[in-house]
């Protein structure tokens, strides 16, 4: 998978003083900690009939054939905050029961993730629906915490209303910063399951590991929302994560009412969990067997 961005917690002394002496609003913290939109690696073309197609740049590092590229569905929808958000539907396993609603990391866009989605979906027998955050890829607006929540809500509505996928067949999958909108949506809607890959407790807790409570100016307070998630939750985290400390995954796991056996990947960092064999093994076990009996 493409790298998800540099350390989130490299702050200068001046920035530390700024945070504590002049506490900013959550949107300022969010922008400072999380959002690193790359130059777009794809575009969405619309022909005279209204049909859309995906066009990738070389930086997307496409790993499959033109036939498989042509099968990827793309569209643009509008959020409640007025932004246009790019969406992608990768039908890896047409006969599969489940579709992942995938929220990606902070330094990639759909073009860079597309090959990964095909590989993941085909291996765990799931279709993959994903979207770009405001300010990423073809999505308009600027990335912000409020836009994150509106973006995933818009994607959820497209998956539900355009494609007719019912909540009991949707698995919410969030990675890194993508766990933030995933937890928010899962705290409001029940679904088949939730997968939190390298989750964070909150923005301040990433920047300042000794933070023990959620302040009014904190951003991304997933630790306060995850207790409201009614669906089964699988937490995945590397024990040597250099961006979001392993303690975040452990704390999130302990707060989940319906947490299943987590996957703690010994020795894994923030961007290499997918390279370990137990990653796919745990996903297959969870989706194929555990959800069937939950």
From Swiss-Prot:
Catalytic activity: S-hexadecanoyl-L-cysteinyl-[protein] + H2O = L-cysteinyl-[protein] + hexadecanoate + H(+)
Active site feature: 176 (charge relay system), 241 (charge relay system), 270 (charge relay system)
Record keywords: Cell membrane, Cell projection, Endosome, Hydrolase, Lipoprotein, Membrane, Palmitate, Postsynaptic cell membrane, Synapse
UniProt-listed GO biological process terms: regulation of postsynapse organization
Post-translation changes: Palmitoylated on cysteine residues located in a cysteine cluster at the N-terminus which promotes membrane localization.
Membrane-protein topology: Lipid-anchor
A molecular function GO annotation: palmitoyl-(protein) hydrolase activity
Transmembrane helix recorded as keyword: no
This enzyme's EC code(s): 3.1.2.22
InterPro entries in the cross-refs: AB_hydrolase_fold, Hydrolase_4
Chief location: membrane
Statement: the UniProt record of this protein carries the keyword Cell cycle: no
Compartments in which it is found: Recycling endosome membrane; Cell projection, Dendritic spine; Postsynaptic density membrane
GO cellular component entries: dendritic spine; endosome membrane; plasma membrane; postsynaptic density membrane; recycling endosome membrane
Membership in a protein family: Belongs to the AB hydrolase superfamily. ABHD17 family.
Biological role stated in the UniProt entry: Hydrolyzes fatty acids from S-acylated cysteine residues in proteins. Has depalmitoylating activity towards nras.
Name of the protein in question: Alpha/beta hydrolase domain-containing protein 17C
